[in-house]
Amino acid sequence: MERALILSGGGARGAFQVGVCQYLQEAGWVPEMVCGTSIGAINAVAIGSGMKLEQMAHFWKIYDRRKMFRITMLRFILSLFKLRKFSPLMDPTPMRDLLSDLVDLDALRESRQEIIITAVNLKTSQLRYFNHNTIDIDHVMASAAVPMIFPWQFIEGEPHWDGGVMDNTPIIPALEHGAKQIIVVLLSPVGAANLSLPQSHLQVMELMFEHSLIGAYETSMAYRASRNKPQPLGRSDHPPATLPFNNCREDQCIATVAPDRMLGFRSFFNFSRPQVTQLIREGYNCARKQLKGLIQ
């Protein structure tokens, strides 16, 4: 396998990935595998089902967010105080209806690209990978079922939720398939740039949360490096995951594309047209800058 594209989770920040994909298409870089989790899973499945990037961008900008995010606040509050059975914040029905209209499952199963999405089994705590031959709407809903926000979904009778809980950047399938060029699209600059120290409690919380999202990816990269050059216990000298195609060995190179600024907590749930438009533009510009002269 030559090329793989990895799409991280990150809620509304997923619009950034559309811009990155627009640049990759323009550059003639077509992945044979696309792996995604959470919002990255939705984008991956859209790509695998044959949706044009122009359609994806249009969809991101125009869908009715008020219908999409139907809040069940009273049930949620009552469940917090144990006055009734646990209830998530959002009603998943609008998202299920949207995905049913958006995703052509027949086209997805016939895709020439390997599409892989993830979800976590609540009972076994197992991170599971599903490919395009088996994916249906339940799998996509499960991968995007952010805990507390959306309810877990049942796959083969077992409850599953957001794969990003355990691995927000699912690079392992690409590594295992021996992809020679891997482009990883992060939805945060954390792990992709040197950052200023946080100056407020909110910034501390934001950075802590971002670190939790990048952790599994950093661990995967450290493991990959250690297979080539064993490190003493407690030490990891693997190159930063951020350096475009600098994380290379003889038979494999990994590039990272990421925003060049902190996006803030609100960006996770801000599906407004202004933010979507801005993030698509930033995704394109960051990819052009960070991958210039490095993809072929």
PLM-predicted stretches and their roles:
Residues 3, 53-98, 122, 127, ...:
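Non-catalytic peripheral regions of patatin-like phospholipases
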Residues 1-34:
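Helix-rich "cap/lid" substructures immediately adjacent to catalytic or cofactor-binding pockets
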Residues 18, 22, 44-45, 171-172:
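Short, hydrophobic alpha-helix immediately C-terminal to the catalytic nucleophile
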Residues 115-121, 151:
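Short beta-strand scaffold segments in enzyme catalytic cores
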Residues 68, 103-114:
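A short alpha-helix-loop-beta-strand transition element characteristic
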Residues 141-179:
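ATP/pyrophosphate-binding catalytic subdomain of soluble kinases
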Residues 8, 31-49:
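Catalytic nucleophile loop
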